[in-house]
Amino acid sequence: MLVLTLATISTLAVSPQNAQAQKEAFEVVSVKLIVPGSGPGRPGMFMNAGPGCSLTGVQVDPRRVAVAAPLFTLIATAHGGNCRVPDMIIGGTDWMKTDRWDIEAVMPEGSPTYTPAQFVGGNAPKINAMLQTLLADRFKVAVHRETREVTVNVLTVGKGSPKLAAANDADQPARRINARKDQEGKPFLEFIAGKATMATLAEMLQLATSRPVVDRTGISGNFNIRFEYDNDGIARPTVFTALQEELGLRLESAKEKMEVLVIDRAEKPSDN
């Protein structure tokens, strides 16, 4: 089962970066509104992190790109945002999270080859640039970035010494949060960060807490991290308790000024 994985935006009309991104475009594009209850849809890789934040039927093979998603998720994917951290994307209307769109597109000859996992994880820059162009053309999407004060979680060392297992050179990086069930069928989540820095841990904790996380541990090095948690604290401790008990780290709420993505405009396209 695919679970949560990791994923520069300025005003589209003026930014040099976005001007460059506008030059990147798919050769062929099909955009269709998905009718609710119309069936299971296209098979493929998926990511589901709650209402308005999902990608399904993801295929990249090798020039053809296909995905089904709400516009909110498509904007976040195209512009390097994170739909799993709501405070970091401002604006938009309800239909952008509820209506789902099926998109099929063909990249130009000579485009880089990506895997579905790279696209879902935000590591397919050429596809993202072409998706920016598609969204601007078909959905009339315009966005910009600005600095706002938002609620964050600050990662610090708890009471006593941190309990972290240092990674070896031979260890492999790993970044995943797996959905599991215990012997009684109660669901919980398995957090795995292999050969990870504290900055990487902070990035992954954004997915677990749906808030920006700022690393203030002062700890350097790579570590193998694994713990189990439950958002409701029933089958397992909450992520906050698990961090303290298993790793000797704390998450504390605070206000910080951070750069956020602001959605200025979007329209529903016509089917083609």
Describe these PLM feature segments.
Residues 1-272:
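Beta-strand-rich assembly/attachment modules of structural machines
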